[in-house]
Amino acid sequence: MEKLKLTIAVTGLNNTDNPGPGIPVIRGILESKEIKARIIGLAYENLEPGIYMPGMINKTYMIPYPSSGTEAYMERIIQIHEKDPIDLIIPNLDAELYTFMKSQSKLQELGIHTFLPTFEQFEERHKANLDKFGEKYGIKVPHSKAIVSGSDIKKLENEFEYPVLVKGKFYDAYVAYNSDQVTNHYNKISAKWGLPVIIQEFIKGTEVNVVALGDGFGNTIAAVPMRKQFITDKGKAWSGITLSDKEMLRITTDLISKTKWRGGMELEMIKTNSGDYFMIEINPRIPAWVYLAVGAGQNIPEALVKLAMGIAVPPYTTYKVGKMFIRYSWDLLGDIQEFEQLSIFGEIEK
């Protein structure tokens, strides 16, 4: 059977100790037996390691940050598309998703496919809305509160017991054991990610995660649970192992069925010593550890590409339990000419 030829643009090429999902997504796509992909990298910084990794990306273009505004952002995407036609874009960072969701119809007119959550799905799972989300869908969640001012911190003792988690609206989470630490983390997070900052009840237990893919009609196409075995100081998994956990899969399939989730997602949960599961976060895109799912037998990036292109995908029903991943540091060597070309012209071909 002839492979489906596609030009696929991917973001999230940072592959350091705070990795983006871009390279794992690309690896999954390149391993597909049914898709022959030409990969375009969309980079925000000219030192994102994924740009220079051999065998991953055919051509990289620099793009502005989403904070530059939807119009400027999409103008650059269209400019790239006119020069180098794109069949599909896979945005992999939370901060980009709103811009791409808002521009879906425009992209579709240009022949650029996406496979993203709806606005309602994206908004209701926000950390600030987690209490309502849990109540609506029958999921246990820790108590959360969004704060927008330093004066709100003094009132927290009326609602929370220390320690608490202090979270950014997109990224970052810190444990605080008193109000001074909350203030510290609040200032750091709000300066980086803006407001609100979310205060969340601290649940004792083991953190477990699920990477999943919904087809938009309530069907779970893929779901693989794992436990982080080593976590960096940024809270990212440095190693992990797939689990046999029917309850995690039940929670996932039930949630996708009720929400009719469209696209990739990551569910972050805490399993308590008594066996209860608390949903602490729902990330509306594929996580950076997705290649573990590929290795376990569920090629989620490949399935997402097919769904985006209107190809029916039967649900995965099995995966390998006990499959592990370990991240490592590796020095890539390159020439200054590559860096200069990217800096001056905003593009580079490998």
Where are the model-predicted features located?
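Short glycine-enriched loops at secondary-structure junctions
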Residues: 43-48, 94-96, 120, 216-219, ...
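Conserved protein kinase catalytic/activation segment
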Residues: 275-277
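ATP-binding N-terminal substructure of ATP-dependent carboxylate-amine bond-forming enzymes
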Residues: 1-115
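Peripheral (often C-terminal) accessory segments that flank ATP-dependent C-N-forming ligase machineries
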Residues: 302-350
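Active-site nucleotide/adenylate-binding loops and adjacent lid/helix of ATP-dependent enzymes
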Residues: 121-204, 216-218, 246-249
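Flexible, glycine/charged-enriched surface loops at secondary-structure junctions
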Residues: 199, 262-267, 314-320
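ATP-dependent carboxylate/phosphate-activation module, predominantly the ATP-grasp catalytic core
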Residues: 180, 184-188, 200-260, 264, ...
